[in-house]
Swiss-Prot record:
Main location: secreted
Record localization: Secreted; Nematocyst; Target cell membrane
Polar residues: compositionally biased ranges: 1-15
Disulfide bond positions: none
Annotated spans, Disordered: 1-29
Claim: Membrane is one of the keywords in the record: yes
Keywords linked to the UniProt accession: Cytolysis, Hemolysis, Ion transport, Membrane, Nematocyst, Secreted, Target cell membrane, Target membrane, Toxin, Transmembrane, Transport
Protein name, UniProt field: Cytolysin Uc-1
Protein role: Pore-forming toxin that lyses bovine erythrocytes at nanomolar concentrations. Is devoid of enzymatic activity. Binds to monolayers and efficiently permeabilizes small lipid vesicles composed of sphingomyelin and cholesterol. The cytolytic activity is not prevented by cholesterol or sphingomyelin.
Keyword Transferase appears in the UniProt entry: no
A GO cellular-component term linked to this record: other organism cell membrane
Domain of life assignment: Eukaryota
């Protein structure tokens, strides 16, 4: 699953995803 990006990319995305989600507000993923 690490190759599929279940832990690697996901761990690096949380920061951008959270910011985006908070900035959008509409997209709470």
């Amino acid at each position: 699953d690490e190759q599929t990006g279940s832990k690697g990319p996901n761990e690096n995305l949380p920061s951008q995803k959270d910011l985006x989600a908070k900035a959008s507000x509409l997209t709470e993923v």
